[in-house]
Every structure is written in C-alpha cells, then in structure tokens.
Swiss-Prot record:
It comes from Shewanella halifaxensis (strain HAW-EB4). InterPro entries: Ribosomal_bL32, Ribosomal_bL32_bact, Ribosomal_zn-bd. Residues 21-31 have a biased composition (Polar residues). This is Large ribosomal subunit protein bL32. GO terms for molecular function: structural constituent of ribosome. The gene is rpmF.
Length: 56
C-alpha cells in the first residue's frame, strides 16, 4: 500500500484539486421544437435528434 513520505500542505492539496470541479452543462436547441436540452439527452417532450423516441 502506498504511504506518503512527506505531508502535503493545504495549498498543494488545493492546487491539485483546482482542476476537479465540474463545468457547466452543454445545452443544445432541439431542431423540431426549439427547446433547450442537454447534449446527447432526450428532450422533455420525447424527441432525440429530431425523431420521436418516447411516446407518452
């Protein structure tokens, strides 16, 4: 099992973690309804890439 040789300071820990945060979600406009939705996800009314995939 790996064990650190020297204690890492709070500053070094923070510098390492500075790239770990999540970015904002990418949004697209649906071609048929003009609705905003997340990329690669079905819209609220059941359309995906211009086709109806979920019947309600």
């Amino acid at each position: 099992m790996a064990v650190q040789q020297n204690k890492k300071s709070r500053s070094k820990r923070g510098m390492r973690r500075s790239h770990d945060s999540l970015g904002t979600a990418q949004l697209s406009v649906d071609a048929t309804s003009g609705e905003l939705h997340r990329r690669h996800n079905v819209t609220a009314d059941g359309f995906y890439r211009g086709q109806k995939v979920i019947n309600k």
